[in-house]
Amino acid sequence: ILTGITTTGTPHIGNYLGAIKPALELSGPETESYFFLADYHALIKQTDPALIQSSVKDIALAWLASGLDTEHSNFYRQSDIPEVHELTWVLTCSAAKGLLNRAHAYKAVVAENISNDADEDKAINMGLFSYPVLMAADILIFNATHVPVGPDQAQHLEMARDIAGKFNHTYKSTFVLPEALIQNEVSVPGLDGRKMSKSYKNIIPFLCTEKVLQKAISRIITNSLE
């Protein structure tokens, strides 16, 4: 199995319950497991190198504190594997633009721009547009057979399969077509009742002092689920 977390901020309880805990439950001595810190994916939204580096350390600590066994798992930072980025370019040349046009994250930004009467390409960089190719490289380079994903991420896995299939057909059978392990969606309420998210600034940090934790909990809107 293979999974990663984008290093764009402070890890929180939602990350643990929705990504870290389920992934660790799937791993074990008999499973070849890959867990990575997706610091190049972070560049799509975060332009401050210091914040990305800080997030790398915090998320690494979160994985280790949650019980990741480095003796039986491969644990790495994405940017430390240059072959991932070499493969990204090779796969980019096999990825159809029409396929990337259908990516949910890209389409959502385009739709928002249109609804705001803005240029549909506003605030869209090539990192966002070609994000599925980098994700495909993350998966295919290790010939991962199974990838745990939430329902909203299943499309990324399908796109990786499409890109791998196109490459295999054009050249030779090289890549395993990975299977999705669809995880039950875990929607953890944040401090304001909305889904816990760094974007909403409503998180309960996973790694913090008791004082900080008490302060965060005291902000919870107690009737937010009513």
How would you name each of these model-derived features?
Residues 1-137:
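N-terminal Rossmann-like or analogous alpha/beta NTP/dinucleotide-binding catalytic cores
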